[in-house]
Curated annotation (Swiss-Prot):
This is Gag-Pol polyprotein. Mg(2+) 1 binds at residues 652, 727-728. Residues 1270-1430 form the Integrase catalytic domain. The active site is at residue 464. It comes from the Viruses. PROSITE patterns: ASP_PROT_RETROV (PS50175), ASP_PROTEASE (PS00141), INTEGRASE (PS50994), INTEGRASE_DBD (PS51027), RNASE_H_1 (PS50879), RT_POL (PS50878), ZF_CCHC (PS50158), ZF_INTEGRASE (PS50876). It comes from Maedi visna virus (strain 1514). One of its GO terms (biological process) is viral translational frameshifting. Its EC number is 3.4.23.-, 2.7.7.49, 2.7.7.7, 3.1.26.4. Mg(2+) 3 binds at residues 1291, 1343, 1379. PANTHER family: ENDOGENOUS RETROVIRUS GROUP K MEMBER POL PROTEIN, RNA-DIRECTED DNA POLYMERASE-RELATED.
Length: 1506
């Protein structure tokens, strides 16, 4: 009993798997399931109740016995609930024991109850059956076939309970599910064939699945007919399927085999359809996407259906049915609208015609046009219909005269079963390969057939290294059957029977392997799955130079080949090399070298991770002495240059190098030596017969050889897209699937003639296809490894960093992001094991690239569309994207910045690289989109800054990268950063102060605007995901809130800020006016305005407040000989304040040891590297270790006094006014003035005022200028008119054949001019918008020309708020100012035209001369006057608005509600909605007065005016 108890504690081992399956059954509708404790409780309770059964094993018989006994028990009222739980748990255990998988406890009880109903009341049932069938044998009781006592059989209908149970399982789990298959196999063992097929037909399920099941049954029937010729004792298909038989006839014993075969066929069909439904290419899973056209959907659907191994009627049914049911909702509605009730029976061509426009932008307009189009005449139906079989219009596929297509040879006119080529293959001679299993291209020179015992029979099998599986035509049924298996090869898809654990014997070696029984195979094949186990190998090396053209190679002139002795190798490596070389010799790849071949190249070997040895050859010396060949292939093909194809195939050439013979006269130079251990025998010398690995010409010889072999074949197939790189072949086409595979077949057969093998395990049919590191998909491409490894902060070796960067650079054509900080990290020590330190900035830069790689996908090239290349400003690099449609890039890339080149030059360099890439990959010249404006690029070209522009180019606005709008002008949760930047104390400074207490400041050169942006950039770098930024720069504030998508980004600081902000969650930007008493804003302004002590480097330590100086650190171990001085440069740059100087002193610990610092004074404002001069006063050498504190830096205040001369009253040096008192300082400016005049030809007054030279000297310069004397203006110009600020005149003028529109501001004389195409109103209105945008005028005067008086022009002037007047007709004085400007402009233009290449540039130079270089009598130019007037207007407007805000009033105060006397007048300090604030003069206090006690009065000035 003790032992039994211990066994019970351990549970029930024989029911371990049963209990495990039972624990998956749910208790109710929720997710709660039975537990192991529930099962053990039920089993132990049963053992306790029925002690007589306790020792019996838990079989299904024992469980049924317990179930019957439990039914006979009546529990007490208090135990009914536990008793019901016991019964339910037992029912679940019984179902698991029988292999059933009910989902819930209730379902398990129903199953047991149903099975119990089939067996309960046996006596009552027996009596009932005995009445119906008196001759029934009572001991054999099965339904619906019943055995009669007379020896015959009868039939009874399938019970409704069983039928309902099967219906329930089919609805819950599916018609082809394992549950339904298991239930049907259980019940149908005694059914007739007719019962099985009728019940299967009445089951609920997908109609397409039922058609596929019927097709599989038809295939089984055809296979039965082929394998079992008609005979006296052979069952026919009609007998197996129960056709033409009554129920009584089908129930007889002679039909038992037919019923079993029928059930087996049904089970096989269910399994085949189930496996088919889970495959990725299942047609029923091909559904139309929302963004996909109906034609593309049909192409994918037909491709999937054509690939299915089913009969043509089923394919036709699937095409008609799935083309409607799997279409999108829009297409279904369109088909319903167009085809009406016959939509389910319509052909695919009719549905494509109906849905041709669904999804396009003009869909609604086309529907409207169709509705308004008159009805066509009858009799024209089908004229535009297109046959999907031959591709010709005028008929449908089912009416095609070309007939059906053979799935074996790809030809039209016959079916596969009637194919002559297939029959001829069955009569091939020994050595031929199986065309159905392997492609017909593997035609080697008589591959051997060997005798293999398969099961109990000896067979001659063809040794085929290209076949994956072992194929036999018949089998003795030994082993374990594993059902049907689908074999896919280049020749098509076929189906066979798989058997495992089959006894195989070759000579004395016996194994248990796997075979495939394929009755239609013309030859039996031993595949790779069993060759290795049996120790069989086959090398088919083709070394016949008659077939493969040989490429001539030779040594350089005067070279005699390598003569390098073989170095010693260990015993282990010699054994590994011997094994490899022996194998190569057997395969015919190396041969024994004759004695007079004296050259030698060393060999060695390494052990791979798998434990096998790999042979390596040191060809460095031979490579040096060998003449080079031209490069056959200049680069790697790129998927962005591929065209989108319907079908693709990727092939790999096996043993590519070892198939091509080496040029025979050259072979003597490739000799190598196999050493003999301990010199126990002579060495063995070999030479290479084929292209060896590691030889520098192997790739070139291989590529030239393949070029010669494939040239003719490629020319014969212009309809395909063919690519080859080394041993990888790409084939793409838009042909039908059979035709495409036929071309692949043809290529394989063609190169097989030269001995090249195409292993099937490396062949890829269809998408996705892996090729050259890329992964090709139907509509896109990406990299095979579409992720980059993560990096973390901390040390990293240069070797590992280089590998990471290499992975990134390889994927740049999908990333397109620069990594300047990571690249900078690679600078310095070039030792591979040297360490670098990864910081947070590097991690962020790397993560940005990883995220971009996840998001990006490349597209294919369309030869009918133009190609565009768009360049953009990146982080210290130029980034560009190549595309044909927006948002669908072909590829992207990065060109890193080049020193000493401007931004424009760098962009042009990147554009050159982009153009070159596009031409190489597509053969087209791209249209280049440059950032900025066209005028800027034309000016850069004219000025000579750039010397090349693309053939086709234009400009664009906006940066396509920044789309995220997460900057708002509201407060967000998070810290606040107060930023400021600008020129402080003559130096650029920037920084921020955060609400968290964090501070940052730094010196940096730049303009005020740049420094303000840099301060924001630094705050964004350090700030969290949510933060606030406060700035007093209106420029920076408006930039942060600007719509960046429409901004021309030319500022690299702005681009970097955009990238930082793009990665934030949300940023609140706020503006405050500067110097207005806001505490935090004043604090940051003071903080960066201080001249602060700044350091760079790690050579100094922070000091305590009580320390005298800062400790300096020795950068490395320094050795100072006795009595000598050494200068030590430390890792420190320092920036002293202007009122400081510093001294480097000796530390007392060093002075005690006789080591002193010499000198060491640092002047105020010094910004360089610190050097320490050390003197060793000892008589022995002193060593200062690295990191030791060896000196100190002491800061001192700077005191400056002027030196007064003693007795000397005159100075000899130059003063502020020149040499002594001569005043001749202006003489040095005369050459500068002459040079300036030669550029701009300004007048004498301008030269006099700008360069400070005498008026007479300036006039001499003008008079000596030949250009100015030839183009002299008239001395008097008459005429005048109204003048005023912001009042302009406009008119057209002509210069040679060019028309110029001239504007002049009448107050300042500022001129604005543009070359126009004509004197039209449209042209004038366009120029008016440009003029208004730059100058904001108020009024304009013109003549009565048609362009000026047009109605549209008047409406535009009214819209812009410009007061427009016209002059007096035929009175030139009304336009005198602009007429005089015409003459001045043309006179100056004539002087400058020879200096410029383009007329527009000369016109711009003229405006510079007249507006900026021309000075008036007061020394001001027209531009100065115009700007001064604008500023005065602003100041007046501001003062006026301030004046309007100042108010005065009388007021009275109240005491206990009673008003006092009126006081005042006084100024209102603040005014609100219901009260004001004033200052009481008597008490000097601020009072709040309600509006009812206030009387406002006019300002004092207005009182005086009155």
């Amino acid at each position: 009993m003790a032992k039994q108890g211990s066994k019970e504690k351990k549970g029930y081992p024989e029911l371990k798997e049963v209990i495990k399956a039972t624990c998956k059954i749910r208790v109710g509708p929720g997710k709660e399931t039975l537990t192991e404790g529930n099962c053990l409780w039920a089993l132990k309770t049963i053992d306790f109740i029925f002690e007589d059964l306790k020792t019996e094993p838990w079989t299904i018989t024992k469980m049924y016995t317990v179930w019957d006994r439990l039914k006979g028990l009546t529990p007490e009222e208090t135990s009914k609930r536990e008793f019901a739980s016991l019964q339910a748990t037992l029912a679940c255990i019984m179902c698991s024991q029988m292999g059933m998988k009910p989902e819930t406890v209730q379902a398990a009880k129903g199953i047991i109850s149903m099975k119990e109903g089939l067996h309960e009341n046996k006596e009552a049932k027996g009596e009932k059956v005995e009445q119906l069938y008196p001759n029934l044998e009572k001991h054999r009781e099965v339904y619906p076939i019943v055995n009669l006592q007379a020896g015959g059989r009868s039939w009874k209908a399938v019970e409704s309970v069983v039928f309902q149970q099967l219906q329930t399982v089919a609805m819950q789990h599916g018609l082809v599910s394992e549950d339904f298959e298991r239930q049907l196999a259980y019940y149908a063992t005694t059914w007739t064939s007719k019962d099985i097929l009728e019940v299967l037909a009445m089951m609920p399920g997908n109609r397409a699945q039922k058609e596929l099941i019927q097709g599989k049954l038809n295939e089984e029937a055809e296979r039965w007919v082929r394998q079992n010729p008609p005979g006296p004792n052979v069952l026919t298909v009609d007998q197996i399927m129960g056709v033409g038989q009554t129920n009584q006839q089908a129930s007889q014993a002679n039909m038992d085999q037919a019923r079993q075969i029928c059930l087996q066929w049904v089970i096989t069909a269910l399994r085949s359809v189930r496996h088919m439904s889970h495959r990725p290419g299942n047609p029923m899973l091909v559904k139309q996407k929302n963004t996909e056209s109906y034609e593309d959907f049909i192409a994918r659907l037909l491709e999937a259906i054509d690939a299915e191994p089913v009969t043509d009627p089923i394919k036709t049914y699937l095409k008609v049915t799935l083309s409607y049911t799997n279409a999108s909702t829009d297409c279904q509605k369109q088909m319903d609208r167009t085809l009406g009730t016959r939509v389910q029976q319509a052909t695919v061509e009719e549905k494509m015609q109906a849905c041709r426009d669904v999804g396009s932008e003009g869909f609604k307009m086309q529907l409207l046009a169709q509705a308004l189009r008159p009805q066509g005449k009858a009799g024209h139906k089908g004229v535009n219909q297109k046959c999907y079989n031959c591709g010709k219009p005028g008929h449908l596929a089912r009416q095609c005269r070309q007939g059906i297509i053979c799935h074996h040879c790809g030809k039209r006119g016959h079916m596969q079963k009637d194919c002559r080529q297939k029959k001829q293959q069955g009569k091939q001679q020994e050595g031929a390969t199986c065309g159905a299993v392997r492609a017909p291209y593997v035609v080697t020179e008589a591959p051997p057939k060997i005798e293999i015992k398969v099961g109990t029979r000896w067979k001659k099998l063809l040794v085929d290294t290209g076949a994956d599986k072992t194929i036999v035509t018949s089998h003795d049924m030994s082993g374990i059957p594993k059902g049907r298996i689908i074999l896919q090869g280049i020749g098509g898809i076929i189906e066979g029977e798989k058997w495992e654990q089959v006894h195989l014997q070759y000579k004395d070696k016996m194994i248990k392997g796997t075979i495939v029984v394929l009755a239609t195979s013309p030859v039996e094949v031993l595949g790779r799955d069993n060759m290795r186990e049996l120790g069989i190998g086959l090398i088919m090396a083709n070394l016949e130079e008659k077939k493969i053209p040989s490429t001539r190679v030779r040594l350089k002139e005067g070279c005699k080949g390598p003569h390098i002795a073989q170095w010693p190798l260990t015993q282990e490596k010699l054994e590994g090399l011997k094994e490899i070389v022996d194998r190569l010799e057997k395969e015919g790849k190396v041969g024994r070298a004759p004695p007079h071949w004296t050259c030698n190249t060393p060999i060695f070997c390494i052990k791979k991770k798998s434990g096998k040895w790999r042979m390596l050859i040191d060809f460095r010396e031979l490579n040096k002495q060998t003449e080079d060949l031209a490069e056959a292939q200049l680069g790697l093909p790129h998927p962005g240059g591929l065209q989108r194809k319907k079908h693709v195939t990727i092939l790999d050439i096996g043993d590519a190098y070892f198939t091509i013979p080496l040029y025979e006269p050259y072979r003597q130079y490739t000799c190598f030596t196999m050493l003999s251990p301990n010199n126990l025998g002579p060495c063995v010398r070999y030479y290479w017969k084929v292209l060896p690995q590691g030889w520098k010409l192997s790739p070139a010889v291989y590529q030239f050889t393949m070029q010669k072999i494939l040239r003719g074949w490629i020319e014969e197939h212009p309809m395909i897209q063919f690519g080859i790189y080394m041993d990888d072949i790409y084939i793409g086409s838009d042909l039908g699937l059979e035709e495409h595979r036929g071309i692949v077949n043809e290529l394989a057969s063609y190169i097989a003639q030269y001995g090249f093998m195409l292993p099937e395990d490396k062949r890829q049919e269809g998408y996705p296809a892996k090729w050259l590191g890329f992964e090709l998909h139907p509509e896109k491409w990406k990299f095979q490894k579409h992720t980059l490894p993560e990096i973390t902060e901390g040390p990293i070796t240069l070797n590992k960093l280089q590998k990471l960067v290499g992975d990134l650079v390889w994927r740049q054509s999908l990333i397109g992001k620069s990594i300047p900080n990571i690249l900078k990290l690679m600078e310095g020590d070039r030792a591979l094991q040297s360490e670098r330190y990864i910081e947070s900035i590097h991690v962020r830069e790397w993560e940005a690239c990883r995220q971009k790689l996840k998001e990006m996908e490349g597209n294919y090239y369309d030869e009918e569309k133009d190609i565009y290349g768009q360049l953009d400003w990146g982080n210290k690099a130029i980034e560009y994207i190549v595309f044909q449609e927006k948002g669908k890039p072909l590829w992207v890339n990065v060109v890193h910045s080049i020193k000493n080149l401007s931004q424009a030059q760098q962009i042009i360099k990147a554009a050159q690289k982009l153009t070159q890439e596009v031409i190489i990959r597509t053969g087209k010249i791209p249209w280049i989109l440059l950032p900025g404006r066209e005028e800027d690029w034309i000016l850069e070209l004219q000025m000579g800054n750039i010397n090349w522009m693309p053939s086709f180019w234009s400009c664009y606005k906006g940066s396509v990268r920044w789309k995220k709008r997460n900057v708002i002008a509201e407060l967000v949760p998070g810290p606040t950063y107060y930023t400021d930047g600008g020129k402080k104390n003559g130096r650029g400074s920037l920084g921020y102060i955060a609400s968290t207490g964090e501070k940052f400041r730094i010196h940096e050169e730049g303009t005020n605007q740049q420094l303000e942006l840099r301060a924001i950039e630094e705050a964004c770098k350090q700030g969290p995901e949510k933060m606030n930024i406060v700035t007093d720069s209106r420029y920076a504030y408006e930039f942060m809130l600007r719509n960046w998508d429409e901004e021309v980004i030319r500022n690299p600081i702005q681009a970097r800020i955009m990238e930082l902000v793009h990665n934030k969650e949300k940023i609140g930007v706020h503006w405050v006016p500067g110097h207005k008493g806001i505490p935090q804003n004043e604090e940051i302004d003071r903080y960066i305005s201080e001249i602060f002590l700044a350091k760079e480097g790690r050579g100094i330590l922070q000091k305590r407040a009580e320390d005298a100086g800062y400790d300096l650190i020795c950068p490395q171990e320094i050795s100072i000989p006795a009595g000598q001085v050494k200068r030590i440069a430390i890792d420190l740059k320092i920036n002293l304040k202007k009122d400081q100087w510093a001294m480097i002193g000796t530390k007392s610990s060093f002075a005690n040891k006789g080591v002193f610092v010499q000198g060491g004074i640092i002047d105020s404002g010094y910004q360089g590297t610190i050097q320490v001069v050390i003197y060793n006063s000892n008589n022995k050498e002193v060593v200062i270790p690295q990191g030791r504190k060896f000196a100190q830096l002491i800061l001192m205040p700077l005191i400056h006094e002027e030196l007064e001369p003693w007795g000397e009253t005159r100075k000899t040096e130059r003063g502020e006014q020149g040499f002594g008192s001569t005043g001749m300082y202006w003489i040095e400016n005369i050459p500068l003035a002459e040079e300036e005049h030669n550029k701009w030809h300004q007048d004498a007054v301008s030269l006099h005022l700008e360069f400070g030279i005498p008026r007479t000297a300036a006039e001499d310069i003008v008079q000596q200028c030949d250009v100015c004397q030839e183009n002299k203006m008239p001395s008097t110009l008459r005429g005048s008119n109204k003048r005023g600020i912001d009042h302009w005149q406009v008119d057209y003028t002509h210069y040679e054949d060019k028309i110029i529109l001239v504007w002049v501001e009448t107050n300042s004389g500022l001129i604005y001019a543009e070359r126009v195409k004509g004197e039209t109103g449209q042209e004038f209105r366009v120029q008016t918008m440009k003029w208004y945008a730059m100058f904001a005028p108020k009024s304009l005067q013109s003549d009565n020309g048609p362009a000026f008086v047009a109605e549209s022009t008047q409406l535009l002037m009214k819209y812009l708020g410009i007061e427009h007047t016209t002059g007096i007709p035929w009175n030139p004085q009304s336009q005198a100012l602009v007429e005089r400007t015409h003459q001045t402009l043309k006179n100056t233009l004539e002087k400058l035209i020879p200096m410029f290449n383009a007329f527009e540039s000369a016109l711009a130079g003229t405006l510079i001369t007249l507006n900026i270089k021309r000075k008036g009598g007061l020394g001001t130019s027209p531009m100065d006057i115009f700007i001064f007037n604008k500023e005065q207007q602003r100041i007046q407007q501001q003062s006026k608005s301030k004046q309007e805000k100042i108010r005065f009033c009388y007021y009275r105060t109240r005491k206990r509600g009673h008003p006092g006397e009126w006081q005042g007048p006084t100024q209102v300090l603040w005014g609100g909605d219901g009260a004001i604030v004033v200052k009481d003069r008597g008490t000097d206090r601020y009072l709040v007065i309600a509006n009812k006690d206030v009387k406002f009065i006019p300002p004092p000035k207005e009182i005086q005016k009155e």
